[in-house]
Regions:
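Active-site-adjacent structural elements in enzyme catalytic cores
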Residues: 1-314
Length: 314
């Protein structure tokens, strides 16, 4: 059974002992392990059921620690670090030779982030080194935004969970690749949008070239067990069934089944999206219908998660 705590020192010692700790960040809860202990890193892959070809993000307390993991920190990287760290931005940089191959999935790059959540930073300070921390859920399942979500995912495992409350951002970090010989690339959409990143870089961000350099790039991801269907035109016939759940983004229609309205503000919607999926997925429904928000840049990360969580979009 999982154990939920707010004892930072207990969690830090647990990590030093090579064990796993679920820790809060401002994006989602992460399944943390010592990034320099091979056995601990393998435990992360095993517990999540995550393929070893999927690289991990190393979480750091301060930007100054990035040089311990990255072989080169370009002026572009320095500008992004200064602008957005601590915060929901991951940078993919050339890896130092000593970084574990299990962390990088055998690649010559490493993904780094400095989280903004105060308890994550306290834990990183107490631990004293980098932590890998992919989302604290079974592979491809809904990412957790509360300690209770993590406990649901690992209800039969003796996992220590550091309770830092609800995650403020609610969607995984934006990921930018800055590798030598390649243009800057936006590998994963987050609530830190393309335009803000480009403004700091002073150049365009290209999309991924298809190589899996970072988490969250697989097509099917972040998905509930209940079939999820995205819609723009309301499927009115489905409103009459108590076995259909609904997630709305503004003006909602009356329905017989349970409904959650996350509103028309993208930041508020993102912060509550995974929690809404957890809530409806627990009700043994036939389907979850999700209203697709407007196609604007502010909603880009939400659209990305909808495309990966839903079986169909219409």
């Amino acid at each position: 059974m999982p154990s939920i705590t707010q004892d930072i020192q207990r969690c830090a010692q647990h990590l030093r002992d090579g064990q796993l700790v679920a820790m809060p960040t401002e994006t989602v809860y992460g399944l943390a392990a010592d990034a320099r202990q091979e056995d601990a890193v393998h435990q992360v892959f095993s517990l999540k059921g995550r393929p070893s070809t999927n690289p991990l993000i190393v979480h750091l307390e301060e930007a100054s620690q990035a040089s311990q993991w990255a072989a080169e920190i370009t002026p572009q990287a320095q500008r992004l670090m200064a602008a957005f760290w601590p915060g929901p931005l991951t940078l993919v940089l050339p890896a130092r030779d000593e970084v574990l191959r299990s962390v990088t999935a055998g690649q010559n790059s490493v993904a780094l982030r400095v989280p903004a959540h105060p308890m994550a930073r306290e834990l990183l300070h107490a631990f004293g080194s980098g932590l890998v921390a992919p989302s604290a859920n079974r592979y491809m399942s809904i990412s957790p935004t509360s300690a209770e979500h993590v406990a649901q995912q690992f209800e039969h495992d003796a996992l220590l969970i550091l309770d830092g409350g609800r995650c403020r951002v609610g969607l995984e970090s934006s990921i930018v690749s800055l590798l030598p010989g390649d243009c800057p690339r936006l590998l994963r959409r987050g609530m830190l949008g393309r335009m803000r990143l480009q403004d700091v870089l002073a150049q365009p961000l290209q999309d991924s070239d298809g190589a899996v350099r970072a988490p969250g790039q697989h097509h099917r991801h972040y998905a509930p067990t209940t079939p999820a269907l995205g819609f723009t035109q309301v499927p009115t016939a489905a409103l009459d069934s108590q076995q259909n759940g609904w997630i709305w983004c503004g003006a909602a229609h009356a329905s017989q089944g349970p409904a959650i309205n996350l509103g028309a503000d993208p930041d508020h919607y993102a912060a509550g999206f995974y929690a809404a999926l957890y809530q409806l997925d627990a009700l043994d429904l036939q389907r979850i219908y999700i209203q697709i928000p407007t196609h604007q840049e502010a909603w880009a990360a939400v659209h990305d998660r909808l495309a990966r969580a839903c079986q169909t979009l219409s």
